[in-house]
């Protein structure tokens, strides 16, 4: 079936009438096949999602007469951490598939007199939830935080979701958007969408600080890169190989990266799978520096998390952090795909580690105030 779809895509104009019909048929057949072959699994998943809805309904009672609440999916770790770092009135909510569950959420919002509902990204079922809330009470403001950038439109899922969300805005079902990268905010504002700017932030005072083990080796971390091309893991590994006496700590490490380190004879202390955020934050405290030289980005949480743990993080020139500051001169990369350049920046970062961390602490004070003001502006308007 996938081969047939790919064949059709080669010869039919994307977003043309025939293509849309074929895509719709393909989607219907694929969905039917999945439901038949995974009936038991689907029932269990939907039962879980209904339980989460009931928990959300109970939590909404705590925000009676509130100016706003924010729904977020706790299983989407980046979005979840972003939401927790920005807002106080937050409600975990996963996918919503049952009509009765959409009705429960809608009724709870209306009955608790919540003035504004913010959706931090969009899960399955949230589009229908937005429609129903507006149909029941058009005075309730609906706002959406878009955590992605234009690169993600290459994904059919994200592109189709983007079209649905933008169409809801044009129909008056969504009142405004917030973006966590300035270029996205500026573009959509100029394109006529009511837009606000937010900046991701982290507060990690509750994370245990661990004593760094004494060693002659320089441990350098690469995290949450996995197999995604944009995360640039192979350039990072190449650069670490060039750093004298260096060890790469890669979590998770995929088979390709593992083979590459063997070819390079690069020593690693790595794990094959993702680990809980709390465990990761303790782990990185053993490092000299962490690498995040992605080819495209939005507002990544990890660089901030790394700095909060006292470890500098080199990051790509594709987000809003540290721009125009001395700190940025140390840690913002301009040639993410150059191992030799990256090696030099790693060494420079290690040599100036104490100064870099101090610069971060000074920068963070002003950054916290900015983040709070952006949130207030978004919530009240």
Annotate the PLM regions.
Residues 209-231, 237-243, 249:
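Conserved donor-binding/catalytic core segment of Leloir-type glycosyltransferases
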Residues 294-295:
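Aromatic "clamp/platform" in nucleotide-sugar-dependent glycosyltransferases that forms part
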Residues 98, 150, 197-209, 255, ...:
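Short beta-strand->alpha-helix junction loop in the catalytic core
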Residues 336-343, 348-381:
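A charged, aromatic-enriched C-terminal amphipathic alpha-helix characteristic of glycosyltransferases
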Residues 4-139:
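N-terminal pre-catalytic "stem/leader" segment of glycosyltransferase-like enzymes
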Residues 312-318:
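Short hydrophobic beta-strand element within catalytic cores of glycosyltransferases
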Residues 157-195:
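A short, active-site helix/loop in glycosyltransferases that binds the activated sugar's phosphate group
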Residues 172, 258-281:
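Nucleotide-activated donor-binding/catalytic signature segment of Leloir-type glycosyltransferases, i.e.
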């Amino acid at each position: 079936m996938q081969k047939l779809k790919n064949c059709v895509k080669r010869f039919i104009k994307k977003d043309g009438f025939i293509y849309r019909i074929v895509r719709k048929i393909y989607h219907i057949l694929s969905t039917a096949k999945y439901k038949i072959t995974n009936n038991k699994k689907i029932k269990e998943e939907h039962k879980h999602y209904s339980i989460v809805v009931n928990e959300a309904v109970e939590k909404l009672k705590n925000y009676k007469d509130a100016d706003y609440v924010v729904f977020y999916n706790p299983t989407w770790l980046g979005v979840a951490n972003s939401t927790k770092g920005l807002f106080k009135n937050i409600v975990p909510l996963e996918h919503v598939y049952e009509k009765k569950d959409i009705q429960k959420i809608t009724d709870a919002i209306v009955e608790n007199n919540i003035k504004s509902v913010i959706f931090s990204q969009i899960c399955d079922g949230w589009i229908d939830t937005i429609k129903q809330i507006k149909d029941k009470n058009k005075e309730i403001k609906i706002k959406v935080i878009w955590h992605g950038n234009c690169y993600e439109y290459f994904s059919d899922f994200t592109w189709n979701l983007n079209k649905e969300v933008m169409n809801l805005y044009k129909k008056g079902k969504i009142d405004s958007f917030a973006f966590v990268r300035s270029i996205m905010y500026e573009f959509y504002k100029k394109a006529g969408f009511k837009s606000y700017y937010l900046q991701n932030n982290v507060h990690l005072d509750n994370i245990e600080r661990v004593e760094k083990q004494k060693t002659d080796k320089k441990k350098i971390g690469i995290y949450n890169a996995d197999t995604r091309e944009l995360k640039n893991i192979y350039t990072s590994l190449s650069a670490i190989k060039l750093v004298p006496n260096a060890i790469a700590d890669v979590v998770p490490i995929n088979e390709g990266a593992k083979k590459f380190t063997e070819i390079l004879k690069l020593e690693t202390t790595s794990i094959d799978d993702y680990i809980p955020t709390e465990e990761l934050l303790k782990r990185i405290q053993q490092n000299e520096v962490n690498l995040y030289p992605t080819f495209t980005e939005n507002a990544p949480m990890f660089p901030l998390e790394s700095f909060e743990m006292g470890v500098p993080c080199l990051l790509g020139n594709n987000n809003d952090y540290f721009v125009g500051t001395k700190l940025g001169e140390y840690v913002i990369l301009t040639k993410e795909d150059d191992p030799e350049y990256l090696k030099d920046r790693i060494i420079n970062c290690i040599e100036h580690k104490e100064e870099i961390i101090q610069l971060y602490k000074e920068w963070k004070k002003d950054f916290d105030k900015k983040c709070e003001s952006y949130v207030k502006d978004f919530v009240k308007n």
